[in-house]
Amino acid sequence: MNALLAVLFVLCWSSGFIGAKLGAGDAAPLTVLTWRFLPLAVALALAAALFGRARWRGLGSRAFGRQVTIGALSQTGYLLTVYQAIGLGVSTGTTALIDGTQPLVVAALAGPLLGQYVAPRQWWGLLLGVAGVMIVTAGDATSASGVSWWAYLVPFAGMLSLVAATFLESRSPTDTDPVVSMTVHCATSAVLFTALAACAGQVSPPPTASFWWSVAWLIALSTFGGYGLYWLVLRRSGVTRVNALMFLMAPVTAIWGAVMFGEPFGILTALGLLLGLGAVVLVFRAQPRGRGAGTVPTDEQSPEPEVVRGSARLRR
């Protein structure tokens, strides 16, 4: 995987936690999410109508429905829980920590669902990464005051929603143009968030420059950057590698928080960052490049003589 894409993905994805906190100071989570996706969906739909009709010709009703479901899980389900957790008082670092356990869940399910088996060295890397993200926010949950224990389950539900979307995309029988996918996902989220905000009476945006700054931040960095690069890296490198990068989200989010909000950045955060980097190195070195890398030897990936990686789509 291109190292530059990996760095950009980590920076842009982690910026979403900061954008959520920026927006939370001016409006309810549903208001922020509605205005994050409404203008974006309109712009993408207009661009598709004017310049991208050819991209949509091969998209059947079944593939369209699948992309709607992926968008609902990966954007609406995931983002709503992240924003609600931060709104309930869970820190950005702890929210990123819970998000950082995603690679372990993906690794456990990748074999039975996709035929992508995790090597012994990769398991060590995954465990090292979990240790890193736990160290980053050690004591945060116990030191936080006024936050209910169940609030920490909210981002966990969002993480599972993103995992479900990832596997649904990876098991898709046909490839969908990335621009088409992005448009469908954003339009789906715009409709769902607007409907939820209307029911809650939270559609109207506040007339403040800081609100629109947070919206611009979320559209440019988090949606086009983080979300778009997530699917690009997934297609290029597979679920294990893209999710290994999630180990870096908690420490990088902590760096964002220190720079943007003056949140403390101490020795534990630095140690967690180093462990996360070590985890990514272990996972990447133990896995062949590419999404459908063919077969892998016994000592690298599995006790079986050979394991064919990927679903029918991944092997194409």
Regions found by a protein language model. Name each.
Residues 1-34, 40-42, 144-171, 191-192, ...:
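Glycine-/small-residue-enriched transmembrane alpha-helix faces in small-molecule transporters
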Residues 12, 16-17, 45, 49-99, ...:
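Specific transmembrane alpha-helical segments of multi-pass solute transporters/efflux pumps
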Residues 25-77, 103-110, 160-168, 182-201, ...:
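Transmembrane alpha-helices of multi-pass small-molecule transport proteins
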Residues 31-42, 74, 79, 83-117, ...:
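Specific alpha-helical transmembrane segments that line the substrate/conduction pathway
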Residues 33-35, 94-101, 167-191, 220-259:
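Helix-helix packing/entry segments at the starts of transmembrane helices
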Residues 37-38, 138, 211-213, 247-316:
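C-terminal-most transmembrane helix of multi-pass membrane proteins
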Residues 44, 109, 118-140, 159, ...:
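Hydrophobic transmembrane alpha-helices of multi-pass small-molecule transport proteins
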Residues 58, 96-99, 115-135, 145-151, ...:
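Loop-to-transmembrane alpha-helix entry segments
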